[in-house]
Amino acid sequence: MMRVKCSICDKIETIDDDTLIAKRLRNRPIHTYMCQECHDRIAKKTEERLKTGKFTFHPGQQKKEKVKK
């Protein structure tokens, strides 16, 4: 079992060592853990902002194809 700390609310939880999130946290220290309560709260507020029409959601940049010469 791996102990992790939520980067928003500082709640400490344990996750299984074999999960994908545990592997990401071990191999890439830049990744941060967020508990399910914080994740749900942020998702709910984001959906509310989207419904107002004043907020635009940019899901991410698409990778450009590299052309070899």
Swiss-Prot record:
InterPro entries: DUF2197. It holds the Pfam family DUF2197. This is Uncharacterized protein YlaI. It comes from the Bacteria.
